Amino acid sequence: MASSRLPASALTLKQFIQRQKVLSLYRNMMRTIRQVPDEGDRKYLRDWARDEFKRNKNSTNQDAIRMMITQANMHHDELQSSLALANVKK
């Protein structure tokens, strides 16, 4: 009998793609947060984002993860819009 070469903990293709989306979103969020001019606000947002991602790190429900990705994208877009408006008003 041939056994699989993949370890039992290997991700499925869907899980792998979803993981890449989450990592990309996290990196984009951190890049956007770096643009926040006030150091205190920047630290607060960075800590908030890290805590949110860390809190949901062990989620396995695909639908819940998709919903969290959608919410995080909305927060990211809102932050980018706020930064754009703040730069226009200067």
Swiss-Prot record:
One of its GO terms (biological process) is mitochondrial respiratory chain complex I assembly. Pfam families: Complex1_LYR (PF05347). The lineage of its organism: Eukaryota, Metazoa, Chordata, Craniata, Vertebrata. Involved in efficient integration of the N-module into mitochondrial respiratory chain complex I. One of its GO terms (cellular component) is mitochondrion. It is found in: Mitochondrion. This is LYR motif-containing protein 2. Residues 1-19 form a transit peptide. Belongs to the complex I LYR family. It comes from Salmo salar (Atlantic salmon). Keywords: Mitochondrion, Transit peptide.
